[in-house]
């Protein structure tokens, strides 16, 4: 039996789950997404979200309200008469009136092993913290911030080469599988809810602009995790002395290098091995401002670098 659903999501991460619902034969009668954002040099062009684009490709009615707190928006949502709302990285808080409207409630796919990393940036924070694993969880939403009871979960390892980009892609497809399984148990009346633990609660705050700049006084391991957590977007950056000129460069990939750190910010000759506060790190993929993404060997053929800061 197909369920009548609304879908709420915004970024690329959400799209595989929307596609999975449609491919499974569920009736997605409406999609909610964040409003189009200004883009371009003069920020005059409005760009729809990836979820809005995906919905319009499948001719699904799409709504992009600034808020769901008004009586008008809540009445519009209630008029959909959905069995359940599926929420994946939507970006708006759902008020009680919205949460209580669907027949079976609202179900959220969250990219962490709750209650660890509740909040906006669970993937990035897990990598930054050096967690050895993370996962995907489906929860039935309540009024709290990612505090709902758990329906299903699956964990995956975080390695020293894991980036946010790679992990997001893997978790989104896991989320799609778990959400389809959740709806199957819901249809059969076999849904089991497990309250979250009251221990081990942490919060994944949004990434701040100042966190994107590399502090070479930090240990190499810390910097390596930071680079992986913010790759490819917004990306870590530093200033480099290139041919006697200071340039801002985005660092997209790195690996830990052997050897003892000497002078902080020093670069080994003919390489991109940087001395950190403790240990050394090798930059392997980077991008000059306005330039192409390059591997270190290609970058070094066109640039002489004497220091980073």
UniProtKB/Swiss-Prot annotation:
Q: Which key words are in the record?
A: Protein biosynthesis, Transferase
One Pfam family this sequence matches: Formyl_trans_N
Q: What class of enzyme is it?
A: transferase
Q: Which InterPro entries match?
A: Fmt (IPR005794), Formyl_trans_C (IPR005793), Formyl_transf_N (IPR002376), Formyl_transf_N_sf (IPR036477), Formyl_transferase-like_C_sf (IPR011034), GART_AS (IPR001555), Met-tRNA-FMT_C (IPR044135), Met-tRNA-FMT_N (IPR041711)
Q: Which residues bind (6S)-5,6,7,8-tetrahydrofolate?
A: 112-115
Going by the entry's taxonomy, the superkingdom of the source organism is recorded as: Bacteria
Keyword Transferase on entry: yes
GO-annotated molecular function = methionyl-tRNA formyltransferase activity
What reaction does this catalyse? L-methionyl-tRNA(fMet) + (6R)-10-formyltetrahydrofolate = N-formyl-L-methionyl-tRNA(fMet) + (6S)-5,6,7,8-tetrahydrofolate + H(+)
EC number(s) stated in the UniProt entry for this protein: 2.1.2.9
PROSITE patterns for this protein: GART (PS00373)
Q: Name one GO cellular component term.
A: cytosol
Free-text function comment from the UniProt entry = Attaches a formyl group to the free amino group of methionyl-tRNA(fMet). The formyl group appears to play a dual role in the initiator identity of N-formylmethionyl-tRNA by promoting its recognition by IF2 and preventing the misappropriation of this tRNA by the elongation apparatus.
Family statement drawn from the similarity comment of this UniProt entry: Belongs to the Fmt family.
Against PANTHER family, the record matches this protein to: METHIONYL-TRNA FORMYLTRANSFERASE, METHIONYL-TRNA FORMYLTRANSFERASE, MITOCHONDRIAL
Supply the name of the protein.
Methionyl-tRNA formyltransferase
Q: Which gene encodes it?
A: fmt
